[in-house]
Amino acid sequence: MYQIEFKEEAFLPRERLVEVGAERLSNQELLAIFIRTGTKKEPVSILSNKLLNRLESLAALRELSIEELQSLTGIGRVKAIEIKAMIELGKRINQSELLLNERILGSEKLGRKMIHEIGHKKQEHLVALYLNTQNQIISQKTIFIGSVNRSIAEPREILHYAVKCMATSIIIVHNHPSGSVQPSRNDLLFTENLKESCEKLGLVLLDHLIVGNKDYYSFREESDVILKFIDNIVEEVFFNLTFTVE
């Protein structure tokens, strides 16, 4: 008797998807379709609910590791891998839709896009977007992921792909895992260095964005502040050199 009830419950979300469409299903029902089956003690609906209740928000699902998923009763290694694959595929579909013939019209639109993509990352990620003469994104590359041994990307890595895809301009985006989007001294110096390197190759650095989990900072929008800061750095370096000579 139990097995018959179990099978009926497991297939119910699938039947509802066919009847009313995927967009009408709850998060629990969609997740239950991927988990597929429950255990002898708990049906799949309970398992999917337990997983969702463990999260602060649905977006936090993408942060769970395979091991963390496996720690839930009823989710083995295969199911955990399938869930991770489902999340990654969804992210790539969303990214490809945004990327397809997308034209960069402003820092805010791009900032919101990149908050969604890398704002939640626990390691620093630096992403380069390469654009054509119509300001359409023709390629997006993750150039750098922070590690214990390395925390700075090199301009040559960014420019290599620019030449390869024949881009005319570049936008750089990186996240601050701390959540603060204020640029550091290294961020400012890196931006100026990259800008000069781009100019030598006839490329335009359109913007450098810093994103957190809720907000973004645009170097282009804050250009006056950046220029003043760089001028102060140059003056400070000049003063130190003069002082050393004396």
UniProtKB/Swiss-Prot annotation:
Motif JAMM motif in this chain: where? 174-187
Query: Molecular function (GO) terms listed?
Result: metal ion binding; metallopeptidase activity
Where is the MPN domain positioned along the sequence?
103-225
Keywords (A to Z) from UniProt: Hydrolase, Metal-binding, Metalloprotease, Protease, Zinc
The answer to keyword Hydrolase applying to this record is: yes
Residues binding Zn(2+) are 174, 176, 187
Keyword check for Protease, yes or no. Answer: yes
**Its GO biological process terms?**
proteolysis
Family indicated by similarity: Belongs to the UPF0758 family.
Its name, as the record gives it, is: UPF0758 protein SSU98_1084
Question: What organism does the record attribute this protein to?
Answer: Streptococcus suis (strain 98HAH33)
Give the lineage: Bacteria, Bacillati, Bacillota, Bacilli, Lactobacillales
